Every structure is written in C-alpha cells, then in structure tokens.
Amino acid sequence: SDPLTVSNMDELPLAGIIRNVAEKLSVRCMKHNITINVHADDNIKILGDGDQMVQLIMILCDNALKYSPENGTVSIGANKLDDGGVLVTVSDQGKGIPEEDIPFIWERFYKVEKSHCRSVPGTGLGLAIAKEIIRVHGASAEVISKCGSGTTFEIKFPKDKVV
C-alpha cells in the first residue's frame, strides 16, 4: 500500500498557506535576524490535502532557515506558469548543496556532511517526506544550488491540479 495518500482533495489558497507558514516561523526568523519575503499570487488555488501542503511548505522553509546565515533572507513564492501550472519556490542564501549530493537529498536519513557546509540538527527525514507529498499531489521538484550561492527548491504543480 502507498505510504502516503491524499485523503482530502480541497481547493487550497496557496498564498494563504505560504503566509501562514511564514508567520509560524517569524519568531525563529527574528531570533536569527533572517527576513522572510513572500511573493505569492493571491488568486492561485490548487487541489490538494491542506495538512500535507502546510507540511510541505513548512519542511522546505524549515530547511531554508536552517541553512541561512544570520541577517540572511528566505524567499517563498507561488506563481502561475504559462502552461497553466503553478510554481512554488523556496530560496535561501545559505552555503548551497554540493552538486554531487543533490540527487540524494530526497532519500531518508541522507544528510549533506561536507566540510564547507555547516552541520545542522535534523533527522534527515524532512525532504523524504516532502518528496512523497510532492509525488502524491502529482507535482515535480527541482533543486537549483551551487556551493556558496544558496539553494532554490522549485515545486511544479501541473495545470490539472490548479483550480
């Protein structure tokens, strides 16, 4: 049986979910003097499980905060694509992910342990859970990263998931 399924397909206001997650993380951001920028189209609605979508955005933002330097910025966006789909992005200004590690970051318990990337707390399960949420929602993910230049996670929802 499938380890994760979409039990409730609802129309989800993506901008509201993103703002909600940003608000939940605001105290942590202030503590580390990190700014969260939200750029989300208020008219975007997707079909999905609300709890899982909150969890997905939270995992991606939590990782971005973990790897962001003091006085850094995390950017979260949601925009419609020309093909009718939706693109959600979460970007940080951290150290980045070595190219050779990118294919493995979605695996359970995988942690990037390189001398140029500081060690951060965590179980190594967040992105594995995120991958499953992305999959069951019919979306796809891409990671754009270069050591020293931060990381951007792009989640693309196809037009049949957009309301």
What are these regions (language model features)?
Residues I97-K111:
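Short conserved segment of the HATPase_c
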Residues D10-E11, M30-K31, T35-I44, L81:
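Conserved catalytic submotifs in the C-terminal HATPase_c
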Residues G138-A139:
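Conserved glycine-rich
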Residues D2-N8, K45-G48:
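Conserved micro-motifs of the catalytic ATP-binding
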Residues D92:
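Acidic ATP/Mg2+-coordinating residue in the GHKL
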Residues N71-G84:
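Short beta-strand/loop element within the Bergerat-fold HATPase_c
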Residues N8-E23, N37:
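A conserved beta-strand-to-alpha-helix junction within the catalytic ATP-binding
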